[in-house]
Each structure stands twice: as C-alpha cells, then as structure tokens.
C-alpha cells in the first residue's frame, strides 16, 4: 500500500483488481441528447396528456361515426326512393307515350297519303286541261303555231314528258371504308357518304352544256325550280330523297353529247372520285329514254293573248 493511501485511512480503491483493470477508468453511461431527440419526440408529460385526450375523445369519435353512418344511410334511402319513384313514373307514362307516338305516326302517314292522292288528282286534271287545250287550239293555223310554241316552252319548263335517245350516267356511292385511318378519306366529317349534292349539280350542269334537252335524276325531272341539295346523309332532288346508285338520264343527240361530256368538268370530277374513293361511274348511250314530266307548279304570273 502506498504512503498516500495510508494517509487516507488505509483504503485502496484498486484493491482486488489487476494492474490493468485497476488502471482502466470507470465509464458512466451518459444518454445521448441527439439520440433522445430522434427517438423520444414527446416528453413523458406530453405523452400522458395526449393519451388522456385520446381516451376522452374516443366516445365522441364513435358518436360522430354513428351520426355519419346514419346520415349516409338516410341519403342512400332517399336516393333509392327517388330512383324507385322515377322508374315507377316512367313505367306508368310509357304506355301513354307509345300511344301518342303511334297516333302521331298514323297522323303523318294519313297526311302523306292524302297529299299523294291530291298530287295525283292534280296531275290528272292538268293532263286533262292540256288535252282540252290541244283539241281547241288544233282547229286553226294560229292555234297550231301557239301549240308549237307551248311545246317548246313546256320542254324548257320540264312540264311535259320526253322520250328520245340520249345518255345514261350511273354513279354508285361505295361509302367510306370503316377501317380507314386517314381523315381525308371522309369528304364530310362523321359521314360515310362520298357522293355529295355538289357533285350531282356539276354533272347536271355539264350535261346541259353538252347539249341535253331534258334531264332527270332517279325519275325526278330537272326543271327551272328544281333544286339538288344535301340534307344530312341524303340528297334531295326537288325535295324527293334519292339514294345510290344515282341514275341520271339526259335526252339529246347522244354522240355529240358524249363527245362534249367526256371533256367536261362533271365527268372529270366523277373520274377523280372513282380513282380516290372507288366511286362507280358508267356513261352509256341509249335509245328511247323516257323522262317524266316535272311536278306541276303554281301559276304566279299570266298574260292574256288575244281577245
């Protein structure tokens, strides 16, 4: 024992340790402040207060959830009731709607039948008037000259039927292919139709320029007041719907007409559509083409000739 140890009362703090263990300093674990900040976010007091708050709020939370579930159930019940009422009303109204539709369809068909009957009667009376007029005017030379002039005017006005040689132009619309990805393949957006009203208008004008004396499209005579226009997916000729294939009859000198029509803008347009879209085009010479008279028009102006 060293002298200094005896002066301290004879106590040796390294007694019982080896020289190496006795010389090793004693380590006292000190908690790391950084580790405490990362692992212990709240003080024990704060944690206790938070836990107490959660225990106090638990009953209120269950009450709020119960109220929310109750409102949701009430809303679902109201929605189901509204849908049930709508279905019941639709079922009760459906028979009446169908009956009204059937009545409207029957009325439209009846009106169409009456209009067709009146149109036929009007055409019959017009033919009788024409026959009587010819009988009366055929007695003298002045009347015959007047009849000849009336025949020329009737041909120009498309008010008399015509039979004679001419050209038959048939145009077939193939419709756009359903698997085309190029938008330019559709001439009208959202429509499968290739032949349009302006194409038929150009063909008719080209036939007039070629020397045609009378023209008809699908049995409808082309006259001064006749229009060719587009109405959705249909082409109306004098308000009569037509469909492919479009048959255009032109009465006149067939060979001279064909020579001019082959170089016309109308046939050029059809050939271009034939190449680009596969439109069917045929031009044939025929004899004995029969064109009906045009629809009878209302007389708006008249002038008396003679006493």
UniProtKB/Swiss-Prot annotation:
GO terms for cellular component: plasma membrane. It is a multi-pass membrane protein. The keyword Cell membrane applies. Residues 1-23 form the signal peptide. The chain crosses the membrane at residues 67-87, 152-172. InterPro entries: DUF881. Keywords: Cell membrane, Membrane, Signal, Transmembrane, Transmembrane helix. It is found in: Cell membrane. Belongs to the UPF0749 family. PANTHER family: UPF0749 PROTEIN RV1823, UPF0749 PROTEIN RV1825. This is UPF0749 protein Mb1854.
